[in-house]
C-alpha cells in the first residue's frame, strides 16, 4: 500500500484553498476605498426609494384615471356672464320714427308672450286670406313710416299655446293704439301707488279697451243654446269691458279652418245681392238676429251690422259705460276728474304727434 506523508496532503489542500480564494476575491476592502463604497451604497438606496415613490404615485394616478375616466369627470359648469338676463328678442327696424318703432316693439313683445316661438297668423293685404307665418319673417320689409302692427285676435290652441292674428294697420292708428296702451299702463301704476282711487276701477269700464274678442255663431244654432251658452259667453265679455265681434254664417262655413277670411269682404261694399233664401230659412235667421239684439241690448251700445241674412253677417258690439248713481257724489266727482285727465292726456299726445 502506498503511503503518503500527512504533511504533503495538508500542504496540497492549503494550496487548493488559496487558489480558490484568490480566484473569487480579486479586490480587497481597504481604508482608501471605504468612503467611495459607502457613497455608492447610499446613492443606490436613495435612488431605490425615489423609484419606489414614483411607482406608488404612478399606481395611484392610474387607479384614479381608471375609476374616473377623463371624459366622465364632472367639472363645475362655468356660469355665463349674463346668466341672469334672458336673451332678448331683437327686431331691427330700418324705417319709422322712434315712437313708431316703440309701438311695433310693444306688439312684437306681446306676440312672444303669447307664443314663445313667434308663430302668428296674418291677414294678407292683397288676397285678404289668413296665412300662417312667424313674426321674425313677417316683420321684414315693413315700412313703419306708412303702416304698423296690431293683434286683432288670439287663437287658443291648448292650455299653453296661443297663436295671435296680426294685421297691418295705418301708422296713425298704430301710434294711437300705442298711446292708449301707455296711458292705460300709467293709470295702473298710479292706482297701485294710491294716487287714483282703486274703487273707481269697479265703477267705470275703460273706453279704450283694446281687447277684441271674436265669437262664431251658426245660423242653424238651436234657440236654447243661443239663449244660454252663447248668451252667457257674450254677456260675460261685455261685462268685463271687452269689445265683441259676432260672426254669423252657415254651419259648414263657420266651422272651417279658414272661416275668418270669408268675412273680410264684408268690410267693403259688394256689388250684387246674394240669392234669396227660402222663407222658412230666412225667418229662422231673422229670429237668431233678433234674439242676439235682445241679449246685448242691456250691456252694449247699438250694434254695428255688416252683411245680410241671405249670406253672412258681422255684429260689432261695444260695451256700455258704467255710470254712477246720481246720489253718489264722490263717484261722480271721480268720474269728472278722470274725464279731465283723459282730455289732458289727449292734448299732450296730440302735441307730441304734431312735433313728430
Curated annotation (Swiss-Prot):
Subcellular compartments: Mitochondrion
Chief location bin: mitochondrion
Transit peptide start-stop: 1-32
One GO CC annotation: mitochondrion
Keyword Translocase: no
Record keywords, A-Z: Mitochondrion, Transit peptide
Classification via InterPro entries: AIM23
Top-level lineage group: Eukaryota
Family: Belongs to the AIM23 family.
Name of the protein in its database record: Altered inheritance of mitochondria protein 23, mitochondrial
Organism: Saccharomyces cerevisiae (strain RM11-1a) (Baker's yeast)
